Amino acid sequence: VADVGCGAGLSTLTMAAAFPDSTFVGIDFHGPSIEMANAAAEEKGLSNVRFEVESATSYQGNYDLICFFDCMHDMGDPVGIAQYAKSQLGENGSVMLIEPFAFDSRQENHAGLGGAFYGFSSFFCTPCSLSQDVGRGMGAQAGEPGMRSVFDEAGYGNFQRISETPTNIVYE
């Protein structure tokens, strides 16, 4: 299992502890976060996980599952990254994407939590994406239509919402 954009590795460490017979690789381009993740794995005594400083288009593998947890909307070239992930999947592999909850239209997202997500997105997510190659600038309220377009453009034949909470949507 690859966890791309893992940051300090909380999601990767959680999965590795829950599934000791599986192997996990946390991937992030931020070196200090990867150092923290490796230290945490050592402290927890987890031998089925490792963390690597890599970009979202440079890691290598043949993965059954590639995860993107709350990070795809921050990436400058989400289509290129989704295409690359597809090239690293095993024969029956899947991508799991978790993104902030958003309704299908901007008008529906202005109140409540959607308004907060727009605020965070304006000051962090969108500038982060725009500073990278391609700079698509999707932001935290891209929603299902935005994410579906990324995976359609990347050549995936299937994209579906599999679960949701008030704060996140899970796609496969």
What does each model-found stretch correspond to?
Residues 2, 12-57:
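Class I SAM-dependent methyltransferase SAM/SAH-binding core
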Residues 18, 73-74:
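A short His-aromatic
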Residues 155-172:
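Core SAM-dependent methyltransferase catalytic element
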Residues 5-9:
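Class I SAM-dependent methyltransferase "Motif I" SAM/SAH-binding loop
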Residues 68-71:
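A short beta-strand submotif of the Rossmann-like class I SAM-dependent methyltransferase core
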Residues 57-66:
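A short acidic, Gly/Pro-enriched loop at the edge of an enzyme's catalytic core
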Residues 79-91:
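A short glycine-rich, Lys/Arg-flanked "PGG" loop and its adjoining helix->strand segment in the class I
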Residues 98-153:
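C-terminal alpha-helical "lid/dimerization" subdomain adjacent to the S-adenosyl-L-methionine
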